[in-house]
Amino acid sequence: MPSSAHLQDPPPLLSRTLTQNEGQTSLRQSSSCGPSAASASESLSGSTESRIPHSKMLQGKLPRNIPLEYPAGLYCCYVVIIVLSVAVVALSVALSVKKTAQISTINTYAACPRNWIGVGNKCFYFNEIPSNWTLSQTLCKEQGAELARFDTEEELNFLRRYKGSSGYWFGLHRESSAHPWKWTDNTEYNNSVSIGGDEKHGFLSDNGFSSGRGYIVRKSICRKPNSYTSQCL
């Protein structure tokens, strides 16, 4: 009779066969669990993504070269800066023009000698010493001037306004009532203002421009170019 030990122990070949069968069974069970594990992983991933804010997900998908929207306040700042810059430039230009005009005015009127009055680019002097027409012209020449003439309406209005109630000799003369009026430089008068009377020498009176006898003594008006204007020309 064989011993009980020999009956309990399986043969070595049978033992190896059982071990291999157990391993294959274990592998099949592991494979069958594969889809379930994958589903669980995907479910976990989905739940994680659902917790991520939608705006961040979209921001991550945008290309980096596309800028985000600027706030409206930033554009307002740009507009304010541009407007202020334009205003500063305009103010600077206006101040520069005003300063230039002031300098021009100072140069026009300040270059006349003392007691002379500047009008445009001319200087006028009201001589209060009565003299005849010829002596009055001589006194004006001694100061580098001539008996006054008017070339513009501005000068004419000035003479009328400033002379007061006295009569003043000015630079018109003629040979006779049949001849044209001429200035002291012998240029012909254009008769822009009529001169009353039949005498040979012109003077400015309360009634306007009149003619008188040259030997009568009157005050006189001298005129010469503005010295600054003469230098610039």
UniProtKB/Swiss-Prot annotation:
* Sequence intervals crossing the membrane: 77-97
Q: Its GO CC terms?
A: cell surface; endoplasmic reticulum; external side of plasma membrane
Keyword terms: Cell membrane, Glycoprotein, Lectin, Membrane, Receptor, Signal-anchor, Transmembrane, Transmembrane helix
What Gene3D superfamilies does the database record attribute to this sequence?
Answer: Mannose-Binding Protein A, subunit A
Q: Which Gene Ontology terms describe the biological processes this protein takes part in?
A: negative regulation of osteoclast differentiation; protection from natural killer cell mediated cytotoxicity
Domain (C-type lectin) spans 119-228
- Cite the ranges annotated as topological domain Extracellular: 98-233
Matching InterPro entries, A to Z? C-type_lectin-like (IPR001304), C-type_lectin-like/link_sf (IPR016186), C-type_lectin/matrix_domain (IPR050828), CTDL_fold (IPR016187), NKR-like_CTLD (IPR033992)
SUPFAM superfamilies this protein is in?
C-type lectin-like
Q: Where in the cell is it found?
A: Cell membrane
Per the UniProt record, one Pfam family is Lectin_C
Query: Keyword Transmembrane helix on this protein?
Result: yes
Give start-end positions of Polar residues composition bias.
16-29
Q: What's a Gene Ontology MF term here?
A: carbohydrate binding
Question: What is the membrane topology listed in the Swiss-Prot or TrEMBL record?
Answer: Single-pass type II membrane protein
User: Which residues are tagged as glycosylated in the record?
Assistant: 132
The principal location of this protein is membrane
Biased composition of type Low complexity is found at 30-50
Membrane-side (Cytoplasmic) residue stretches: 1-76
Disordered: where is this region? 1-52
Function according to Swiss-Prot or TrEMBL = Lectin-type cell surface receptor.
Name of the protein this chain belongs to = C-type lectin domain family 2 member D5
Which organism does this sequence originate in? Rattus norvegicus (Rat)
Protein's gene: Ocil
